[in-house]
Amino acid sequence: MYKIKTLNKISEQGLEIFDDNYEVGDDLEHEDGILVRSAKLHDYDFPAELKAIARAGAGVNNIPVDTCTEKGICVFNTPGANANAVKELVLCALILSSRQVIPGIEWVKTLPADDFGKAVEKGKSQFVGPEIDGKKLGVIGLGAIGVNVANAAVKLGMEVYGYDPYISVNAAWKLSKWVHKAATVEELFKECDYITIHVPATPDTKNMINKKSLAMMKDGVRILNFARDTLVNTEDIIKALKSGKVARYITDFGSKELVETENTVVLPHLGASTPESEDNCATMAVKEMIDYLENGNIQNSVNLPTVVEP
C-alpha cells in the first residue's frame, strides 16, 4: 500500500481517483508521495520512503527542486490545468486596467440617497477610460496561459504581440496566426499599450520589469502581472505609477506598499481560484503520481526526464 500525504486542501475529485491500494491523509508518516499546493517545503524533513511530490499547480517555487533531485524524488507539476481560470482573470484585469470601473464603484458608494441619479450623471465623466479594441497588447511568455490570453485578446479586437524565445512546438501550434511575433522583448515594450507577463520565476526573469524596461515603454502603459511577484521590481513600478509613466498596474501578488499606491489593483492571488481549476489540477497531479508509483512513467516532471512506457 502506498501512503500519500496531503499538505494542503486537495480537490476531492482528484483524491477519489486513488483506489484501495492508497492511504491518503494529512497526518501520515513515512509517506511515498506528497500532494501539495502552496505549502512551503524548503524546510520539510523528507522521509526516506518519499518517491514523488506532485504540485497541483504550475509553479514549484515552494519546493526545493534541487534537493529533491539529489534525493531521487520526482517532482511533478500540472501545466495548463489552471490556464483557463487564469486567462479569464487576466481578461477581467485587462478591462479593469482600462475602464475606471473600480474607482467608479467606490465613488458611487459615497453618494447621498437624495438626488442619487442626478449626482451620478453629473460626476460620471471623471471615470472615462479607453476601450481595448484596436489597442496593442504585449504578451510576455507563451506557455499555456500566455497563448490563451493572446488568442482571446485577438478575438476582442486587440493587436497582439507575443514574445517567448523558448516557446514549445505545442504552444506554437495553438497560437493564433494573428499574433505578431516580437523579435525581442524590447520591441514589445516599445510597441504596446498594455503588457501582461506570463513567465516563470527564475534568476533570469527576476525584476524583468524595472526602471530600465519601464523607460522603454509608452507613457501611460498598463501592466498586468498574474505570474509571479518577483518579476516586477516593486520600488520601480511604484515610482512609475506616481510619475504617470504607468497608468495602471494590476497584480495577483501584492504588498501593503502596492495596495496603498494610487492606480494599483492588488488581488489576493485569485488566478486559479475556481472549482474547475482546483479539480483539474488535483486530477492531473493524482494521475501523474499514480502513473509514476505504479508504472514508473514520468510526465510533467520539472526535475526528471519524461519516461513513458510504450
Residue ranges and their predicted role:
Residues 1-78, 190, 210-212, 216, ...:
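An N-terminal-biased, well-structured beta-alpha scaffold segment characteristic
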Residues 5, 161, 230:
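Conserved beta-strand positions in the Rossmann-like core of class I SAM-dependent methyltransferases
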Residues 257-274:
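Short FAD-binding loop at a beta-strand-to-alpha-helix junction that anchors the flavin cofactor
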Residues 271-273, 277-310:
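NAD(P)-dependent dehydrogenase/reductase Rossmann-like domain
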